[in-house]
Structures are given as C-alpha cells and as structure tokens.
C-alpha cells in the first residue's frame, strides 16, 4: 500500500481463487502472505448469493476503528450478529442430522438467511450506520433483547420500537 502526503492511498488487493472451492489446495495454503485482513467469500446456498464468511474472514485493524471511529454500538452489534449466525450454523447441523429444532433454532435460521441477504452479501452497498440499523432491525424481528446479549444501555437506545 502507498499513502500519499497530500492524502489518499493505494492498496493492493490480492485475490486468490480456489480450484473447486477447495480451501486445502496447496497454492493458497503456501503463499505465506501476512496481511492486514482478508475477506473469505463463499456462496450461501440458503440465499443463493455470494457472502463474506464472518468465520473465515479476519481484520487486524478493526480494533483500531470499531467503536472508536464508528458508532458506539458497533462492537457489540458485530459480536452479537456473528454469535447468532454461529448459533444458526449449529441449528443447520442439527437439522441436517435429523434432530428436532427448538423455536430459538428456527429463529436463528431465519435470522441467518436475512443477515446473509441484507448484510453479508457482496452486492450490499450501505454505509456503517445503515448496516448497524439493519442489524438492530433483524435483532428486533427475530429475538428478545435478552437473547441478543447486548448492554442494556445500547438496547434502550437502539432496539427497534414496536
């Protein structure tokens, strides 16, 4: 990356494709690049879109920005959304293995579909404020405040009004 004295920068974005989606392929495993972050894209068959996979993506710089240069609720919303998305992955596994799903499982699956479609899909183009507002809207649609596990002062301020 290059940063110019009068402002602006150029960042090199390397793209690695995996033959047949095989993440164990030797070429990407042996590149050895140290990056400031990576976005792992995959097709979400439940919504038919390519999404940013939050479990395999990483950012070494987010802690410098999130909640400091973004809205106060950003860290808690991010953590809650990823946790609920993870709960949905567990519910998906239960369903695939023939186990009964609880009401909570059903709601996490519905949440995950909307979360993928409205926030993780690569064709989504919204700013951070809209992203946070959308996440709160999804929380309110599928969960009770206690299930989301976000500080009460943030729930009081941002939870969607009925």
Question: Which positions does each model-derived feature cover?
Answer:
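P-loop NTPase catalytic core
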Residues: 1-162
């Amino acid at each position: 990356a290059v940063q110019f004295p009068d402002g602006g920068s150029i960042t090199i974005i390397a793209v690695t494709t995996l033959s047949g989606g095989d993440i164990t392929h030797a070429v990407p495993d042996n590149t050895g690049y140290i990056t400031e972050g990576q976005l792992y894209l995959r097709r979400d068959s439940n919504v038919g879109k390519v999404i940013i996979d939050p479990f395999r993506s990483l950012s070494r710089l987010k802690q410098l920005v999130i909640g400091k240069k973004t809205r106060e609720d950003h860290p808690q919303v991010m953590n809650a959304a990823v946790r609920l998305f993870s709960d949905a992955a567990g519910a998906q596994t239960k369903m695939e293995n023939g186990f009964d799903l609880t009401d909570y499982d059903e709601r996490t699956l519905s949440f995950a579909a909307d979360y993928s479609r409205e926030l993780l899909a690569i064709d989504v183009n919204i700013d951070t404020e809209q992203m946070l507002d959308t996440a709160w809207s999804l929380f309110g649609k599928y969960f009770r405040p206690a299930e989301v596990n976000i500080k009460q002062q943030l729930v009081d301020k941002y939870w969607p009004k009925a």
